Amino acid sequence: VIEITLRHTIIRNIENRMILIPNSKINSATIINSSYGDSSTCAFVDIGVSYDTNLDKAITVMREEIMKHPMLIDHRSADEKKAGVPVVVVRVINLGDSAITLRAWAWASTAINATIMKYDLFKSIKERFDVEKIEIPYPYFNQIVKNE
């Protein structure tokens, strides 16, 4: 927040742009403050793998690559640690037309670090999948031309 007046509020977004919002909108809106209290942020790392993929292997590779990232933090509660919940949870979240989508929950200390970490992880996981021969599929179509 840069300035609050009787008629409007000016905020600066992550791209350093000034946004003028009428207070009537703010009064009736849900406000998300990412820096209030706990600034740690979860980055969802979603990657599609082929239906032929050994899912346990792909999950292990994703978890290992994320655990190596220097911006990763352990965001588990004491109860989660006691229960043996891993620092990085990876789950199947979708069975799509051309891929099985895996999602990893990776925590960083700030929203900026989470964004940087996420983009770094896309690269390192892709490179590791190449080494491990884990396919990231892409949709393709066969076109059939009928002679009439």
Description of each model-found segment:
Residues 1-82:
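Soluble accessory domains appended to multi-pass membrane transport proteins
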Residues 33-34, 49, 53, 63, ...:
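Solvent-exposed, non-transmembrane regulatory segments of membrane-associated proteins
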